[in-house]
Every structure is written in C-alpha cells, then in structure tokens.
Amino acid sequence: MQYHVDGELVAREDATVHVEDRGFRYGDAAFETCRAYGGEVFAWDRHLRRLENTCETLEMPEAVPADLALRVAETLDANDLADAYVRVSVTRGVQPGKLTPREEVDPTVVVQVKPLPRGGTDGEPVWDGHATVQTVKTRRVPSAAVPADAKTHNYLNGIMARLELRRVANEGYQPDEALLRDVDGNLQEGTTSNVFFVDDGTLYTPATGELLPGITRELVLELAADESFPVETGRYDVDDLRDADEAFLTNTTWELRPIETVDGLQVGTGPITALLQRLYRERVEARCYK
C-alpha cells in the first residue's frame, strides 16, 4: 500500500509526519473522508469545499493545494484501487511548540486509501448488519467552543463517547455507534455519523448548528426533496428516535445504515429507508460507474 505525503508517493510503512507537526501535537488539522467508486471520488466538489471551509475556520485558507484531486488520483492509481476509502489530511505543518500558531503556514498534506467493496446498484454494504446504537453520557462539545462544522483532527469528543460504548459492551451487546446529545439533552449525531428517523411518513433529522453536517446527510436531504417527502429538521429528544417507525445513520463509508436498536429498544428499517438507500445507490451508479 502506498500513501501520498507532501507531494510524494511513499510506502505505507515509510509514511510519517514530523513529531513537531501541529496536526500530531495539537490536532491542528483539517481532514475529509471520501469514497471512491469505479475510480472516481463521489461528491468530490462537496468534500473539497468543506475541507477548504475548515481550513478557513482554522485561519489557514491557502493550505489546501491546488493539485489535491491529482494527488488523490495518483494514490488510487498507485494502489490499483477503483473502489476505496480515501482520507485527505491537511495540517498546519511543523512549527515550534507554542500553542499560538504562526501566521505563515507550510502545510503537511497526506492522502491515505484502503480498499472497499464495489458500491452502486450492484454493490454491497461495508457494514455487516443493521446498526445497534447507544446513547452516551458524553455530550457534544458546543459549537461555541469548537466550531461544529469544522472537520478537524481533534476527535477526543468522539473517542470519549466510543470508550463509553466499550464499557457497556458485553458478549451479547456490542453497540456499533454512540449517540451524542448537546448540553441541553437534544439529540445531535453519532460519533462519525448523522442520524435520521421516520415517523408517520415524515423524515426527521437534527438541525445543523451543533453537529457536523455530513455530505451524505446533505445528499439524503436532496434525494428526499426530489421525491417530495415531508422533511423536518429541528431539535429532538432521544425518545423521538426510540419511538420512530424507521431510523438510519449516514456517513460517507456506510452510506445509509438502518438502525436496528436504540438503547436496546427495537426500531428497524422500513419503506422510506429502503427507497432512500436505493436512490443513493442509483446516484452513485450513474455518477461513477456509467
């Protein structure tokens, strides 16, 4: 396996960053997780825009290289991968060990890939079953503290939530995802996913502001609008999710993953989830395999 590090393809075992890199030292970096289907990165323009927006939030607006798409393509080609997970990281680079960053930025740019199954209408899911989700005590860091719409390397909030999952897990109960609430107790998101639920034919999802608006979330809302589904975004309690007719998680790798249980209570899939899954796969097929 080869990765792209600062403009050069290197073997995975030789892919390193400097110990004084601020991405390593402080999590001072932006990243995007993308998915390639048939050799093409799906929704690349949206991922690139969010990466650039995160870098602007971090006050390093020129950090994303103009040839980033080429670096991604070279990494896929070097590994002979058409269907793949793609992670792009842009750090503030190597700087002295002071919390306040320098204004001048010499970014470290890394592209990592790994194989995934084919997607689209003839594909298969990367997950091995419907999701078991668990509400955790860890709360979503308020956007006033760390901007929710910035996708940065600092994932300690999600890590603490996943550690809670590990503590509650046992031989018969292995949750796949932790659900985070805000400080007021409102449902927000999973640690690496957005959440949707269906009740009486209406599709619901928490409003942006205190969560990371996922690219797959955005696409699902567009697909629902195209089908004239009633859609509402707002503030919801975990009980709204537990009592739903259908529920699912979204992220770039999972696409749409139905939720089987919430805190041990059965929820499951249904016709709206199934239709949105099909429409999403059809869009992938049309954009990337034809």
Regions found by a protein language model. Name each.
Residues 1-63, 100-290:
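Helix-start/capping segments and mature chain N-termini
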Residues 66-122:
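Active-site pocket-lining segments that scaffold enzyme catalytic pockets across diverse folds
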